[in-house]
From Swiss-Prot:
CDD domains tied to this protein: TRX_NDPK
Disulfide bond entries: 34-37
Official protein name in the record: Dynein 14 kDa light chain, flagellar outer arm
KW Magnesium (keyword) present: no
Highest taxon listed in the record's lineage: Eukaryota
Keyword Transport: yes
Alphabetized PANTHER family for the sequence: NME/NM23 FAMILY MEMBER 8, NME_NM23 FAMILY MEMBER 8
Main location: other
Subunit structure: Consists of at least 3 heavy chains (alpha, beta and gamma), 2 intermediate chains and 8 light chains.
Record-level GO cellular component terms: cytoplasm; dynein complex; microtubule; motile cilium
Compartments (UniProt record): Cell projection, Cilium, Flagellum; Cytoplasm, Cytoskeleton, Flagellum axoneme
Boundaries of every Thioredoxin domain copy: 2-109
Task of the protein: May be involved in regulating the redox state of functionally important thiol groups within dynein.
């Protein structure tokens, strides 16, 4: 799907995922023999359109293509890696749409403005004598 970019090589991985500051990158790691998980594509599509005002990108990559992902070769379930400022900040194993939804929403959120301090109770007025 057009909103998911497939990572083809280490150079693209480095440029798009590890060297892109300020953006949450959601990376689906799949096996070449089963391809990207179709079960989560609707979840990703909904998140993509619902959160289009946030710095958020979706990627898919076969674990066999990148030496940096060799630990995931042979896994029977998809792995979802979350990167921000070049660092992995979260990982989900398996198709867990509610958890994916929650994590993407939380990690892609803009920092809310600080809460205003609570107003101190008003001091009683001094009585005139």
């Amino acid at each position: 799907m057009a909103f998911i970019t497939e990572i083809a090589n280490e150079a693209q991985w480095k440029t798009e995922v590890l060297e892109t500051p300020g953006t949450l990158q959601v990376v689906e790691v799949f096996q070449s023999w089963c391809g990207p998980c179709k079960a989560v594509q609707s979840t990703f599509k909904k998140l993509y359109f619902d959160l289009n005002d946030r710095p958020l990108k979706f990627y898919s990559v076969s674990s066999e293509r990148l030496s940096s992902l060799k630990e995931y070769v042979g896994k029977c379930k998809p792995i979802f890696l979350f990167f921000k400022d070049g660092k992995q900040v979260e990982k989900i194993e398996g198709v867990k749409a509610p958890q994916l939804n929650r994590i993407v929403t939380e990690l892609s959120g803009k920092n809310p403005p600080p809460a205003a301090p609570a107003a101190a109770p008003a001091a009683p007025a001094a009585e005139a004598s």
